[in-house]
């Protein structure tokens, strides 16, 4: 019996388990090869068990969330991919602090808070992905970021139970954290606690609607992973990519969006290799022409 077989037996009672699941079905890019094991969980306890079981079996594990902000290799992912659908939320006695499981839709939670007249997340209503992913990448837009309202997170510790960690200890920076720098490798976000402020629901919903309208006008609606690159200090990434002559450039069925050059889109049956080529070409051109290094915001996942 292989390590994967042993792990599959252990995971069976804790979620919906599939073998060789094509990850293109589970990413906003619509790109990605198969996962050896693919487990859908619906509670933070099941997520913690799965991550710990994979650790004990020495099988690599990846928490996928909603599949945004990632480019999964055509060869897929070896080991276990956990589809996190843990979405329970609970308010404290003040009604201002919420404990939310990491598989909750970040945008839906933000919009719900606006409707309740709670201020701090109106900027997030159009951001794809889960709350867990928002923690890992310190999601932000329109002058706000999750670090502004995040108090602490509960992490799954390999070979152990959950542990609450203060937000100040997560190394949150622009579109990154200790997770993205590899300093918390192997630790999964189980829950997050956010603290909001009293506000006016009508005003917050108006702000959210304005952000929605801006995104609709400026960003492509097709299959993509969100912003491809972080914005460097010198200039917004889209301006540099545009100036480098890449607006609308294609490779296979992958393309640089005509509407917003920092969005790379899947226009049919694009391969991860074609998207990766466009990313590398943008880095090369911008580096050679402007002396600026573009750092990907999208994460490369799997067997590259």
Per-range role (PLM):
Residues 81, 122, 154, 298-299:
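Residues embedded in well-ordered beta-strands within globular domains across many folds
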Residues 2-131, 135:
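Anion-binding (especially nucleotide phosphate/pyrophosphate-binding) glycine-rich loop
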Residues 57, 64-66, 149, 222-223, ...:
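Short, basic and Ser/Thr-rich N-terminal targeting/leader segments
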Residues 18-19, 25-27, 70, 156-285, ...:
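Phosphate/pyrophosphate- and phosphate-bearing ligand-binding catalytic cores of soluble enzymes
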Residues 104-111, 140, 177, 183-184:
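N-terminal short leaders/motifs
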Residues 113, 131, 135-139, 154-157, ...:
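Short, well-ordered alpha-helical segments in soluble proteins
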Residues 32, 39-44, 71-89, 136-167, ...:
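Structural signature of FAD isoalloxazine-binding scaffolds in flavoprotein oxidoreductases
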